[in-house]
Amino acid sequence: MLESHLIIYFLLAVIQFLLGIFTNGIIVVVNGIDLIKHRKMAPLDLLLSCLAVSRIFLQLFIFYVNVIVIFFIEFIMCSANCAILLFVNELELWLATWLGVFYCAKVASVRHPLFIWLKMRISKLVPWMILGSLLYVSMICVFHSKYAGFMVPHFLRNFFSQNATIQKEDTLAIQIFSFVAEFSVPLLIFLVAVLLLIFSLGRHTRQMRNTVAGSRVPGRGAPISALLSILSFLILYFSHCMIKVFLSSLKFHVRRFIFLFFILVIGIYPSGHSLILILGNPKLKQNAKKFLLHSKCCQ
């Protein structure tokens, strides 16, 4: 018999899972229909579609972890499962990083020659960013598969083992290298891009307030809404990365509140940010409304 707090937690996990599948599914379906109609896809739509697909698989795994934790189902640790998990996790991280870089290049106003060069070519670089991410993540998975005998299972045992074990020095060294290669690099790129974008939008907002003080100008709130959207992206992305670091470096007893809280917060990112993307994109927002209205009419 499940305890009451576990039932509430599982209901929240189900809602989170359904929201993540719906929001990311909307992004994939809408951009897929546009691709069929026009036989081409805009760079941003391509990046969003790839990100949404990776988040769907990530959401599936997070829900699988929730089912394991709640119902004490045995987790089968094999190289294939570990490779799929690592591939989806790292690919989603890099695609989200490139989305932040894309927004920065398109919206931010910086006069540095390198930034101007990036601003003019960012659209053409998107397919290469995606391809480069696939190759890089594949290399990371090959590295993990080489040390899967003592590294990846140790990472997963942090979730589901009750007895703590002392890390070996070689395992710790590899985990440090893995952290730098997998988390630090994309996180640093993302922080630089998004903070630069936030400062640029903040400066633009202050300039608008000074020039049009006391007057009502159409679209005056657009920079503020964009700034709030980017800030929410930053908070979700950063908290997601930090919790992954905690879960991979510390041991938690299953069903403890802190462990359940961390897993729930991890699931908020792929569903919550996709919802923000839909609300901030007129095309996606309109199609999401049409889908909801059609669903109500069919009932």
Curated annotation (Swiss-Prot):
Glycans are attached at residue 163. The chain crosses the membrane at residues 10-30, 56-76, 82-102, 125-145, 179-199, 223-243, 258-278. GO terms for biological process: detection of chemical stimulus involved in sensory perception of bitter taste. SUPFAM superfamilies: Family A G protein-coupled receptor-like (SSF81321). Its main location: membrane. The keyword Transferase does not apply. It is a multi-pass membrane protein. Residues 1-9, 77-81, 146-178, 244-257 are extracellular. It is found in: Membrane. Pfam families: TAS2R. One of its GO terms (molecular function) is G protein-coupled receptor activity. GO terms for cellular component: membrane; plasma membrane. Coiled coil: none annotated. Disulfide bonds: none annotated. Residues 31-55, 103-124, 200-222, 279-299 are cytoplasmic. Keywords: G-protein coupled receptor, Glycoprotein, Membrane, Receptor, Sensory transduction, Taste, Transducer, Transmembrane, Transmembrane helix. Belongs to the G-protein coupled receptor T2R family. Most taste cells may be activated by a limited number of bitter compounds; individual taste cells can discriminate among bitter stimuli. Receptor that may play a role in the perception of bitterness and is gustducin-linked. May play a role in sensing the chemical composition of the gastrointestinal content. The activity of this receptor may stimulate alpha gustducin, mediate PLC-beta-2 activation and lead to the gating of TRPM5. This is Taste receptor type 2 member 1. The lineage of its organism: Eukaryota, Metazoa, Chordata, Craniata, Vertebrata.
